UniProtKB/Swiss-Prot annotation:
The lineage of its organism: Eukaryota, Metazoa, Chordata, Craniata, Vertebrata. Residues 78-107 form the EGF-like domain. This is Protein CRIPTO3. It is a peripheral membrane protein. PROSITE patterns: EGF_1 (PS00022).
Amino acid sequence: MDCRKMVRFSYSVIWIMAISKAFELGLVAGLGHQEFARPSRGDLAFRDDSIWPQEEPAIRPRSSQRVLPMGIQHSKELNRTCCLNGGTCMLESFCACPPSFYGRNCEHDVRKENCGSVPHDTWLPKKCSLCKCWHGQLRCFPQAFLPGCDGLVMDEHLVASRTPELPPSARTTTFMLAGICLSIQSYY
């Protein structure tokens, strides 16, 4: 493979990953008003609208000027009923989750979201497709432009836990991504 083809291939892979992230963020945006879908491990997850009391003033500072109250109670007095999986309820609004758990109420377990031996949010190249483990499902995108694929997408049966067949909407997205990649390749 000459240098030009390698550069085109690299750009195509970068575009696929960027478009995939955009679709993921689009799915995340549908979860709720300014709610973080998955904070990084150790971070605190909270909804933006839950940190203000019901009797908030008519004039609110811009979100960049908000300061969380510092009066967190002693651990013996904390209300732990709002959190699952050993999380600590803070200000009766959000949870500080233990490692491997996340979500508003520590309801999601990272350990259950892997695809067999493939960790969550990991890309896995397979013959003529590029797969990603996302919340326990291995989702594959055809890569018909790869050398040796000759425009054909090979039907691969990948072994992973909890990996159902893609729904029709995901297939449409996959073909749309493949079309975008092919148009990018033909442009160069």
